[in-house]
């Protein structure tokens, strides 16, 4: 199937503004949209939209949204671009967590909480600033609050669920709307020796009957996107145990206040925000 990438580079503020516009406009279309730092010294970021077959139509929509001629288009070979894009990435340290591919096992140091996630069909390897922030908040929250169960909503590769399980042998429900992600999540849980603690399920939002068996949750983590997080605020609060914690990410710096307000409206209290590489992770109770 023909694949194309529409891409545009700019300074951080302009790239984030453009990413926000496209993320909201294409939310229901299923096109992967990414923002990546390509020049650390000059703080230049690249926004990419990945499409199949209908590149001209999508390019016209992009031009109408952000202005004509800003985005270039390139044809992509028929390869697994998630795997390809992660091949050159280094392992990531977040708190005591060390997220790595199988080729970097030799870099594990004494005291590391190692999580092995190879690139594949599901996103969420820990290389993203948004995931790293979640991992740091998870370590702090689990060690201080001692939750008895947890939910990883939009689990992707299950890196967050695995992190919780590595810290505490508690029941963890890991859900995603993508059945491929759910399969990968289960495989990764087994690879990391925590499959007995993690139940995976394909579920959109909280409509699946499995939630009735596991909720309320002492800890809910959700590393998805700002708009779905805002829409899900009432349901997430409904499934949170009294005194429980919520950790949210997948949120750009510029989206922080809107997401926080949605949860404060539900009666939750802001505990902390971590800023990592243009992304934020929010802890509420």
From Swiss-Prot:
Catalytic reaction list: L-lysyl-[protein] + 3 S-adenosyl-L-methionine = N(6),N(6),N(6)-trimethyl-L-lysyl-[protein] + 3 S-adenosyl-L-homocysteine + 3 H(+)
EC supergroup of this enzyme: transferase
InterPro entries: Ribosomal_L11_MeTrfase_PrmA, Ribosomal_PrmA_MeTrfase, SAM-dependent_MTases_sf
GO biological process, one term: methylation
Family listed: Belongs to the methyltransferase superfamily. PrmA family.
Described purpose of this protein according to its UniProt entry: Methylates ribosomal protein L11.
Entry protein name: Ribosomal protein L11 methyltransferase
Species this protein is from: Brucella canis (strain ATCC 23365 / NCTC 10854 / RM-666)
